[in-house]
Amino acid sequence: ATLQCSWALTPTDCKTTKPLAEKALDLINKWRRDGYLFQLLRVADAHLDGAESATVYYLVLDVKETDCSVLSRKHWEDCDPDLTKRPSLDVIGQCKVIATRYSDEYQTLRLNDFNCTTSSVSSALANTKDSPVLFDFIEDTEPFRKSADKALEVYKSESEAYASFRVDRVERVTRVKGGERTNYYVDFSVRNCSRSHFHRHPAFGFCRADLSFDVEASNLENPEDVIISCEVFNFEEHGNISGFRPHLGKTPLGTDGSRDHHHPHKPHKFGCPPPQEGEDFSEGPPLQGGTPPLSPPFRPRCRHRPFGTNETHRFPHHRISVNIIHRPPPHGHHPHGPPPHGHHPHGPPPHGHPPHGPPPRHPPHGPPPHGHPPHGPPPHGHPPHGPPPHGHPPHGPPPHGHPPHGHGFHDHGPCDPPSHKEGPQDLHQHAMGPPPKHPGKRGPGKGHFPFHWRRIGSVYQLPPLQKGEVLPLPEANFPQLLLRNHTHPLKPEIQPFPQVASERCPEEFNGEFAQLSKFFPSTFPK
């Protein structure tokens, strides 16, 4: 028998580890390619393994999704609250993170790997038998792609700058029912499909569409009102060659596609794209000469006539957000002029707490969350698509460098559909992943980016939690790191993730988020 050497990890204090945990979470946000920015609620557990040249941290982080897309490349503290009338959502998560801090002059932090689980708790918080408003978190977002396409067409008709954009991924759909209205709030990412533009600046965007229907409406093809706002983000390269550290900033576009210069420049925190093949994601020394400040996006405001009309309106330049409002004409008559300036169709959604979160999906085969699925224990043996017991994934993670089935790094987005020569069956030969129609896993490779990065990290979206349920823990196994130790030994080596919590953890929840604490496991093994 072979004796595998292992050194005991040192429990450490969650409170003193928080600054490093914040940096690690920021790296996770910068690495991801879909979903919403995580903000740190608390450090739930912390261990370390120190050596002369580096210290490896093993962290458990309780997080909450913000309303900002990861495409914005913002720090979560720079994610301004949504000041519109649309509801916000409560989506919580927990991440198990391994990160290494090096003892160099920059105290460089490297993100080695992470696994996260997320779930919406909005319905559990807001829906009661006496509530006049009901919130539903729509798990299957794909049926709303057509609605997103139509909303984007409205937007494109008002601005030539967006003419070559197409819907990339429907991220989040929420239904709010109350009174005489049913509103659907649809968030989706978009991609610039102009080849001449894409090869110079791979531009992506993020849109929010509010679709309003009569409460009895069964046809979701033609909403009575549409409001849409979009932002565009450009991935431009700045920095030294050795570090390959382009900054990821926004490009403000006017209605003619030109940059807007009417707004003062405001510095933003920003991050780096994932490292190239074979590297981990890390911070590093600042760019030589600093980085030019980023200006906020120009998002003019306008109102839109019904689908099918040719009339357009100028964008008033004194506004800083794009809201295109669409109202179909009553029975064959076009409306005579736009609605009152700034008026939301039928007012805000009915009063009450809105639901929060991205469309949860069942986790695929792969390193699933720890423990049982959120809605009761699985039947005897491994469930077909739910999270198997901790430490026993049915197929294990995909081979190193290969994303799970259907989530490849290949440039197969709305602009370039997969060829017949390389379909899902070809990807499946390289890696075991979720079967078709179960796109539960969102890793950094998911999404249609033309970059070929080494895949690390996973985010599993689980079904919404109900009252009395707690968030299943993420998988604690990182076999890729342990395997890599034997071929590329590190000092200190990566150890198995600790199974016993530190006595000096967890942190207390901030009072602002105290209502979320009941959805996290209250105790850890000690």
UniProtKB/Swiss-Prot annotation:
Q: Which UniProt keywords apply?
A: Blood coagulation, Copper, Disulfide bond, Fibrinolysis, Glycoprotein, Hemostasis, Heparin-binding, Repeat, Secreted, Signal, Zinc
In this chain, the stretch annotated as Disordered covers 243-449
Biased composition (Pro residues) is annotated at 347-401
Q: What is known of its domains?
A: The His-rich (HRR) region contains approximately 12 tandem internal repeats of the 5-residue G[H/P][H/P]PH consensus sequence. HRR binds heparan sulfate and possesses antiangiogenic, antibacterial and antifungal properties through binding Candida cells, and preferentially lysing the ergosterol-containing liposomes at low pH. The tandem repeats also bind divalent metal ions and heme.
Q: Which cysteine pairs make disulfide bonds?
A: 14-505, 68-79, 95-116, 193-415, 207-230, 272-302
Per the UniProt entry, the glycosylated residues are 115, 192, 240, 310, 485
InterPro entries according to UniProt: Cystatin_dom (IPR000010), Cystatin_sf (IPR046350), Kininogen_Fetuin_HRG (IPR050735)
Q: Which GO terms describe its biological process?
A: defense response to fungus; fibrinolysis; negative regulation of angiogenesis; negative regulation of blood vessel endothelial cell migration; negative regulation of cell adhesion; negative regulation of cell adhesion mediated by integrin; negative regulation of cell growth; negative regulation of cell population proliferation
Q: What is this protein called?
A: Histidine-rich glycoprotein
Region Interaction with ATP5F1A, annotated ranges? 31-74
Q: Which GO terms describe its molecular function?
A: cysteine-type endopeptidase inhibitor activity; heme binding; heparan sulfate proteoglycan binding; heparin binding; immunoglobulin binding; metal ion binding; serine-type endopeptidase inhibitor activity; signaling receptor binding
Which residues are tagged with the site Cleavage? 303-304, 421-422
Gene3D superfamilies xrefs = 3.10.450.10
